[in-house]
Regions:
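RNA pseudouridine synthases
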Residues: 1-240
């Protein structure tokens, strides 16, 4: 049927139902939800949890936890991770409730802010522009390399003493391990980050948390701005 829309008409679009991957197993565990609407979900991920299954950690991932949340609440959406975090990074993760919403978000700038605990006393603020590439001898490790992809991070120091700094970091690009690689590059690896030279006697997971997300909603066209506290990192800073 061909019909020309008229002022005042209401148009309803029903997205097709998606079927989750058969490899995903629902992981029933309480989910820390900080924002939800018909299209998006923002949750707070703990440390020691993958966003998605991997060979080393095939189950109990965040996406499987969200899948269980769908089942428990009779929701038929299929979650898609939009902003992924490393296994040991904590904080905010944005998920889309449909592949089409995920696609729309891929064309929207998402501002992300992190809090990092690093070795040594950092400068009051800084800009790190250094290309990042995969290390030749590893499929996991990244490094600053002239052959890498452009990467830019900016930071400001919130608190600092001789052996440790608490920094607010803003990503301007989204390379794998970007903050971890950039802070190693400037001589201030993240505390607890053994992969990038930040070993610590008491802390064995890197101290990094995504504390803020801001973007324009792909459907509602309003600004979504979510911020969480970082009390744990402040406690660690005071302890060190």
């Amino acid at each position: 049927m061909r019909y020309q829309l008229q002022p005042g008409d209401k148009l309803t679009i029903i997205l097709p139902t998606e079927i989750p991957s058969a490899n995903l197993q629902a992981f029933h565990h309480p989910l820390d939800i900080v924002y939800e609407d018909d299209y998006l979900l923002i949750v707070c991920k703990p440390s020691l949890q993958n966003c998605a299954p991997s060979r080393e950690h095939p189950h109990e991932s965040l996406i499987e936890q969200v899948l269980a949340y769908c089942h428990e609440n009779d929701n038929d959406f299929t979650p898609h991770i939009v902003t992924r975090l490393d296994r040991n990074t904590t904080g905010l993760v944005l998920l889309a409730k449909h592949g089409h919403i995920h696609h729309l978000l891929s064309h929207i700038k998402i501002n992300k802010r992190y809090i990092a605990l690093c070795h040594g006393a950092t400068q009051p603020e800084g800009i790190i522009e250094a290309p990042i590439a995969r290390a030749n001898d590893s499929i996991i490790t990244r490094q600053v390399s002239s052959t890498g992809k452009y990467a830019k991070s900016t930071y400001r120091t919130l608190n600092s003493k001789q052996n440790v700094s608490l920094c607010e970091v803003t990503l301007h690009t989204g390379r794998t391990h970007q903050i971890r690689v950039h802070f190693q590059y400037i001589g201030h690896p993240l505390i607890g980050d053994a992969l990038y030279g930040g070993n610590h006697d008491m802390i064995h997971n890197h101290c990094l948390q995504c504390t803020a997300l801001q973007f324009k909603h792909p459907i509602l066209h309003k600004t979504i701005s979510i911020t969480i506290d970082y009390k744990q990192l402040i406690c660690l800073y005071n302890m060190l």
